Swiss-Prot record:
Substrate binds at Q181, L182, S183, R558. The lineage of its organism: Eukaryota, Metazoa, Chordata, Craniata, Vertebrata. The modification Phosphoserine is found at S3, S6, S10, S13. CDD domains: DOPA_deC_like. The modification N6-(pyridoxal phosphate)lysine is found at K396. Residues 1-24 are annotated as: Disordered. This is Glutamate decarboxylase 2.
Length: 585
């Protein structure tokens, strides 16, 4: 006999599940009962299940149960079909939602309750009295809840509980006191755009399935190229899954530009290629070289000065060394806003060297690209207009929700030639519209998420001036922090001088270490301070800031600010909290 749910009236089974006491039978009858309107279905379900028979998640402790949606409605229709009518999620499953027959009412109610959960989380994210994180160790979370996937479906009441539980233990990255990563903040327009994008649920490979999004990508990338300084916004570009992939795109295109035959014949057809980047650059350059078969040994790290900027004379020296060995320099990746120090390489000097030796110049402005929106700070990227390609991540300094990373290329058509494969089932050549808007073939991906809409909608809502105010405020907050701690007892700066970006790097020195000479023992003990304070931050949930060693410098705090919700008071709180958590070390 068919199992419950396999047919409209099929509820029994060979194993005795036709017994009215059996929960599987009750669920099957309940699905039929939900076809009735006016609350009758829910009442029948309640009789079938009984309070003791409601499905419950097995294993582990349970979060508080969500209350069933029991709203009143004034439509005066009998029976009532509007979303405000009573819906009891304990007796509903995903199969009762659209596209199920009569699934509109439970669908609207369910999504409204999900929205309520999300909106409560949004409000809490900006509430300074709430924790940034409710930290639990991995084994605690694994033991406390049953996260395993089951063969049988759970009801919608439990699904809502999973939503609540997930957010309960999520990091509030929009919290004004979350300073841990380069991507922070929670923009309301960007959030709304992301919801819309998920609702549209389309792919970016052709105009026919994403007409508006493809046009918005064209408009937005052109505007970004104009801001970089390429005449008329000429060139090409694409949104990618992140800065690491954007940097790999640049490496891929630079290699193709110099040796187009590599596309068909592979690395065996080309000489030993060498890329150059600073010792403070992002690790993604080496990852890209590994993925493309170039090899990490073929990425030469150029020395930096004490502020983390590439030294041009060392770049030229290493280029000449590579050429003397018979290798072929094909790419220099300069960084505009390094991950740790927030340093900006001297782009004009790097551009001169690249021009002299005919090498592709890439600028990794994933972190620093946002400063191009500020008239006060864009000078730090002087020379970016001479680059052949630029990585720019609006999901970092501009506060666009993750993910939103762009790779901009100065030469139009090069990306298409490098990556296109002419898949005839997608990119037919006899379509009835302009095929230049079928942009998917220039991407490495086939399935590509719509990342542009949140940036475009935020830009429309804020204007360029709004982004400028955002950038200027964050840099002012970084300067405020620097001015407070540079001469404050118990703090030592990692490098001298005002930071160029919002990165403020410092050591907190507890009272017990302040009396020690600056020797190996002191450095060894100091290296343990930041990790302990960070652990205490997370366990208390009050704030979060990152730390790391770099070169010969032991663990230090790296404070970054990209959330415009932060204030001077939040900076003051951070300083006081570090001192409170570290004074006994």
């Amino acid at each position: 006999m068919a199992s419950p749910g396999s047919g409209f009236w099929s509820f029994g089974s060979e194993d005795g599940s036709g017994d009215p006491e059996n929960s599987g039978t009750a669920r099957a009858w309940c699905q039929v009962a939900q076809k009735f309107t006016g609350g009758i279905g829910n009442k029948l379900c309640a009789l079938l299940y009984g309070d003791a028979e409601k499905p419950a998640e097995s294993g582990g402790s349970q979060p508080p149960r969500t209350t069933s949606r029991k709203a009143t409605c004034a439509c005066n229709q009998k029976p009532c079909n509007c979303p405000k009518a009573e819906v009891n999620y304990a007796f509903l499953h995903a199969t009762d939602l659209l596209p199920a027959c009569d699934g509109e009412r439970p669908t609207l109610a369910f999504l409204q309750d999900v929205m309520d959960i999300l909106l409560q989380y949004v409000v809490k994210s900006f509430d300074r009295s709430t924790k940034v994180i409710d930290f639990h160790y991995p084994n605690e979370l694994l033991q406390e809840y049953n996260w395993e996937l089951a063969d049988q479906p759970q009801n919608l009441e439990e699904i809502l509980m999973h939503c609540q539980t997930t957010l309960k233990y999520a990091i509030k990255t929009g919290h004004p006191r979350y300073f841990n990563q380069l991507s922070t903040g929670l923009d309301m327009v960007g959030l709304a755009a992301d919801w819309l994008t998920s609702t549209a649920n389309t792919n970016m490979f052709t105009y026919e399935i994403a007409p508006v999004f493809v046009l918005l990508e064209y408009v937005t990338l052109k505007k970004m190229r104009e801001i970089i300084g390429w005449p008329g916004g000429s060139g090409d570009g694409i949104f990618s899954p992140g800065g690491a992939i954007s940097n790999m795109y640049a490496m891929l295109i630079a290699r193709f530009k110099m040796f187009p035959e590599v596309k068909e014949k592979g690395m065996a057809a080309v000489p030993r290629l060498i890329a150059f980047t600073s010792e403070h650059s992002h690790f993604s350059l080496k990852k890209g070289a590994a993925a493309l078969g170039i090899g990490t040994d073929s990425v030469i790290l150029i020395k930096c000065d004490e502020r983390g900027k590439m030294i041009p004379s060392d770049l030229e020296r290493r280029i000449l060394e590579a050429k003397q060995k018979g290798f072929v320099p094909f790419l220099v990746s300069a960084t505009a806003g390094t991950t740790v120090y927030g340093a900006f390489d001297p782009l004009l000097a790097v551009a001169d060297i690249c021009k002299k030796y005919k090498i592709w110049m890439h600028v990794d402005a994933a972190w620093g690209g946002g400063l191009l929106m500020s008239r006060k700070h864009k000078w730090k990227l002087s020379g970016v207009e001479r680059a052949n390609s630029v990585t720019w991540n609006p999901h970092k300094m501009m506060g666009v929700p993750l993910q939103c990373s762009a790779l901009l290329v100065r030469e139009e058509g090069l990306m298409q030639s490098c990556n296109q494969m002419h898949a005839s089932y997608l990119f037919q050549q006899d379509k009835h519209y302009d095929l230049s808007y079928d942009t998917g073939d220039k991407a490495l991906q086939c399935g590509r998420h719509v990342d542009v809409f949140k940036l475009w909608l935020m830009w429309r809502a804020k204007g360029t001036t709004g982004f400028e105010a955002h950038i200027d405020k964050c840099l002012e907050l970084a300067e405020y922090l620097y001015n407070i701690i540079k001469n404050r007892e118990g703090y030592e700066m990692v490098f001298d001088g005002k930071p160029q970006h919002t990165n403020v790097c410092f050591w907190y020195v507890p009272p017990s270490l302040r009396v020690l000479d600056n020797n190996e023992e002191r450095m060894s003990r100091l290296s343990k301070v930041a990790p302990v304070i960070k652990a205490r931050m997370m366990e208390s949930g009050t704030t979060m800031v990152s730390y790391q060693p770099l070169g010969d410098k032991v663990n230090f705090f790296r404070m970054v600010i990209s959330n415009p919700a932060a204030t001077h008071q939040d900076i003051d709180f951070l300083i006081e909290e570090i001192e409170r958590l570290g004074q006994d070390l």
